[in-house]
Amino acid sequence: MATVQLSRSIRIRKTSKKTVFPSQITNEHESLIMVKKLFATSISCITYLRGLFPESSYGERHLDDLSLKILREDKKCPGSLHIIKWIQGCFDALEKRYLRMAVLTLYTNPKEPEKVTEIYQFKFKYTKEGATMDFDSSNTSFKSGTNSEDIKKASVLLIRKLYMLMQNLGPLPNDVILTMTLHYYNAVTPNDYQPPGFKEGVSSHLLLFEGEPVNLQVGMVSTGFHSMKVKVTTEATRVSDLESSLFQESGTTEIAHQGLDCDEEEEECNTEIQKMNFVCSQQSSERSRKKRKVSEPVKVFIPDRK
C-alpha cells in the first residue's frame, strides 16, 4: 500500500473546466460554500495521497494548474461513504456556526483509540457582523472586505502545501483506523446537538502518541466571514526528507485540549507533548476540568490496506 501512496501525485494542467472554488466571495453564503469546498478538498487530498481509498473513489477537479482528486460516493468502496458522511456532518455544524474544530485521527489499536499515530486538525472561526478576525498563529487581521484574489491565492497555497506534505510523509501502518471528532463553541451550541452521522463523544484529558510527534502548520485561509486553519501532527520519522522549515512550529511542541489547538475563548491550556511515546495531560485545575462538548462518528472506518 505504501507503493500506492507514493506513486500518487499532483498533476499539472494548463486548462480546466471544472473548478474547485467560486471566483468571487462577496457575502457570507458564498464564504460558507468556499470553506466547505476547501475542507472537503483537504480531506480528499489527505485520503488520496495517504492511499486510503482506490482511484475509483475520486473525481477530478482543478485549482489553477493543479489537477485535484476529490472524494466521491463509491458504492464499491463503503469506506468512502463513511468519510463523505463525516464531511456532510461537518457541513451541518459549519452552517449553524457551531463547529470550532474537526479532527481527523488515525490510530492502530481499536482498543486504544487514544493512542494515535497521525492527527489532522481543521480549526474554524466566524466573524461577528463583519468584525475584524484575528488568527492565533500570526499578528495579521482579516476583515470582511478581504479581496477575492487574495482568498484564492491563500487557498491555492494551502492546498499546494498540503499536497507537498502528503507526498513527502512516510507510509502509514497497514492496520490504521480512522475516526473524526468534532469540537464546538460551547457558548452557542445546544447540549443536545449532534450532526448527521455523529453521536456524543467522550471528552478525554489524555492523549498518547506513538513515537516522537512533530507539529506541522499547513496554512490558513480567511474569507472575512469564515476562516480555516490546518495543522498536522505525525511521527517525526515520517518527515525526515521534508523541508521542515516550511511547516514546523518553532520552540516546544505544545498542544492543548486532547492534543489540539487552544482557542482564546476556551480555558487556558498548559499541555505539552513530550518526546518518545507520551503524552499530554492537562493540569487538574477546576477550569481544565470543565466539560467540553465533543462528537464522534457513529462508526469508525478501517481501510482495507493490506
From Swiss-Prot:
The keyword Nucleus applies. Residues 29-232 form the HORMA domain. It is found in: Nucleus; Chromosome. It comes from the Eukaryota. This is HORMA domain-containing protein 2. Interacts with HORMAD1. Its main location: nucleus. InterPro entries: HORMA_dom, HORMA_dom_sf, HORMA_MeioticProgression.
